[in-house]
């Protein structure tokens, strides 16, 4: 009998609870109907890249490709003939000679060039790096030397038809202290000969050829 009363009490308790839940739900529905609808928009977050795709992307980014092979083929010692023009109408350009040691660094991912020579009666040293970015599919070159305290950085793309890479960059003019644009064109003449042409700007923004370096591989 106690068991019967127990189950009966439990049944009544459940029934009461159900009625309370129904009343609460009805009250909630009624109250919801009286509340004005508010529309909100949320931006969908970018879906996270799965670990496999991420690993593949970084592996492709880090693996040397065909442009790196071409850079590797330039390893060696190069003799350089340098010509400088100070202005568009310079009839007496300055000429110097130098040598460059070219090698690949960091597992064949970057090219390093170390230049040495004599300029204006002083020892000259310069270091340049060349990188090919697999992600952006463009080249980046940097330049520093012992006759300045700034770094020149330029980017460009290779044109297979002309076998040349055109770089564009900006530098601060030591005279005006203002930024100005410059352009460089590196042309592959043959496996052992290259030409680098640098174009500067006059104060009024006109471009002129300011430097040429003819590089020949030492055999």
Language-model features: locations:
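Amphipathic/hydrophobic helical signal segments and adjacent flexible N-terminal regions
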Residues: 3, 19-91, 218-219
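Sec-dependent N-terminal signal peptides
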Residues: 6-13
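A short acidic/glycine-rich loop-to-helix N-cap element
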Residues: 62, 177-178, 202-210
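Residue-level recognition of beta-strand termini and adjacent short loop/turns
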Residues: 106, 188-192
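Low-complexity, intrinsically disordered Gly/Pro/Thr-rich segments
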Residues: 192-204
């Amino acid at each position: 009998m106690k068991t019967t009363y127990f189950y009966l009490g439990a049944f009544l308790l459940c029934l009461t609870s159900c009625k309370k839940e129904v009343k609460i739900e009805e009250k909630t529905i009624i109250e919801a109907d009286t509340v004005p609808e508010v529309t909100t928009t949320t931006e969908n977050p970018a879906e996270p890249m799965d670990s496999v795709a991420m690993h593949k992307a970084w592996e492709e980014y880090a693996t040397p490709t065909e442009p790196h092979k071409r850079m590797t083929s330039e390893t060696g010692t190069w003799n350089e003939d340098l010509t400088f023009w100070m202005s568009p109408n310079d009839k007496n350009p300055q000429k110097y000679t130098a040598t460059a040691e070219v090698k690949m660094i960091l597992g064949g991912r970057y090219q390093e060039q170390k230049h040495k020579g004599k300029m204006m009666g002083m020892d000259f040293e310069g270091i340049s790096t060349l990188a090919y970015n697999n992600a952006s599919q463009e080249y980046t070159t940097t330049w520093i030397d012992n006759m300045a305290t700034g770094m020149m950085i330029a980017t460009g793309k290779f044109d297979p038809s002309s076998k040349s890479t055109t770089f564009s960059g900006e530098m601060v003019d030591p005279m005006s202290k203002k930024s100005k644009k410059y352009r460089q064109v590196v042309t592959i003449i043959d496996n052992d000969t290259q030409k680098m042409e640098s174009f500067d700007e006059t104060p009024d923004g006109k471009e002129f050829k300011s430097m040429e370096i003819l590089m020949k591989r030492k055999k």
